[in-house]
Amino acid sequence: LHDPCDNTEDCEDGLECNRNKCLIPYDSDKTCETGWDCVHGVWCSSFPGGSPGCRMDYRCKNEQCEDPATECVDEICGRKEGERCIGPCKAGLTCRNGYCRKPW
């Protein structure tokens, strides 16, 4: 995990080369510890009684987001300013008091 790579063949079985690192793909059976273990735009999450996995997909589909409260930036559907942090905030914003806001 996190080994440098040029393509997926450089990674151990079950991992994907993403942004030049071997990472866990979306909906894999592999266990993650943090979101940094998952491919770009996918979050590590766990359900009660289950092991953590790369199960929350926030990647844009064809550069579009289904949720109008989000905007596609850097291939991720990020929550807009003033929206609740129920997913990643748009680039340049941070989650503060439960809402996506500009940094201090």
Swiss-Prot record:
One of its GO terms (cellular component) is extracellular region. Keywords: Disulfide bond, Ion channel impairing toxin, Neurotoxin, Secreted, Toxin. Expressed by the venom duct. GO terms for molecular function: ion channel regulator activity; toxin activity. Contains 8 disulfide bonds. The cysteine framework is C-C-C-C-C-C-C-C-C-C-C-C-C-C-C-C. This is Turripeptide OL55-like. It comes from Iotyrris cingulifera (Sea snail). The lineage of its organism: Eukaryota, Metazoa, Spiralia, Lophotrochozoa, Mollusca.
